[in-house]
Amino acid sequence: MFSKIKGTHDLMLDKMVCWQKVENHIRTLFAKYHLQEIRTPIIEYRGVFDRAAQHSEMVSKETYTFTDKKGRFITLRPEGTAGVIRSYVENKLDKTSQLHKFFYYGPFFRYERPQKGRYRQFHQVGVEILGQSSPFLDVEVIFLAYKTLKSLGICDITVKINSLGCKTTYNNYLQVFKNYLQTHYQQLCPLCQERFEKNILRIWDCKNCNNEPFLKQAPRIFDHLVEDAKVRFLQVLEGLKQMNVNFELCHDLVRGLDYYTNSVFEIVYNNEQGHQAVLGGGGCYDNLVTLFRGSPSPGIGFALGMERLMSILATRSFCNKNILPSLDAFILVSEPQFFYQGLELATTLRHQGFSADLNYKFLSFSKSLKQALKKQPLYLLILGPKEFANNQITIKNTYTQQQTTILQKDVVSYLQNNKELNYIHEN
């Protein structure tokens, strides 16, 4: 027997129903923001991710990369932004003056240590908006990420936010920070000594060094923002207040990818035990399109991790409230010679927008009934010898236990007038 690969998981049955419900909810919400879905390949040339985040540990240590039959390096996508930018430039959308608002959803891959809420194949839903840079756009994008979680009933969340400033601020601060840490180099853990040379801002993320006094006393990037960047960031903070977003200024927030500029943020969930889990994050990337040899085109985006999101929702009313079953009707055919009449009826119901199923084995009535009820239909439609002879069908509501016999030609109108089914189709 084969088992699934470590760090992956199967989605099926009730879990799949809950996932689909959440996916549909998010799609409906994003449509109201006039976001268009974009689907990029799961595989890209390795250079796509090298170009976007050459010095990030995700690219250097966590990607699944292999060579194809022509010796080219292919990578399973570890994140969504790089593929969207590659597509944006390749399709010459950077040459237009339009604001492009995209969302994506799908699987991603990183080779990291599996643990609760973290997998090697995982799912993200993300938003990328390209073509403009504005503090007001920052506010709406952050608010959308916040609103998405709140609309799912996850209210105990906080937006942690910082600014990395413009390119000038970023470069100046890197030198200031490096000069400061030079005198504390021996106090850095081995990983942070490596980061010191390649991606120094990631030292702020280190769990080993983060509580050390020398890092708490380190220069903050906020204090080195040029005036325009500081004014811009203060406008973002004011906008979040206006939108009643629960946020916290976090000076050590830098995010894991090195293409971010200006506003960066994470959304953390505060559970009942007082622990925090990052549900998603994002920020601005004013220079990323030019790294892909596109025309200057600023952008902002975010991604939410579905596995962590679903682990919270699994215990919430969004997935657990008592909803009516998704199967409208099960047609119980008692004899093989009645099967095609039952199949025609099922086809008619499906054509009219109802979900319908029927049996393919013909057991005793009691056994067939037991099998049918396992499908949890709202209505059981029984086609036996008497019904077959008179072009009738016996309909039983599996919740109220009410039963009636009507002509087969009246089944559709009967179901269309049913309040329970109207509830299902409206929700």
UniProtKB/Swiss-Prot annotation:
Reaction(s) the record says it catalyses: tRNA(His) + L-histidine + ATP = L-histidyl-tRNA(His) + AMP + diphosphate + H(+)
GO BP term (any one): histidyl-tRNA aminoacylation
Any Pfam family hit: HGTP_anticodon
Any one GO molecular-function label of the UniProt entry: ATP binding
GO cellular component: cytoplasm
Enzyme class: ligase
Cell compartments where the protein resides: Cytoplasm
HAMAP family, per database record: His_tRNA_synth
Subunit structure: Homodimer.
Protein name (Swiss-Prot/TrEMBL): Histidine--tRNA ligase
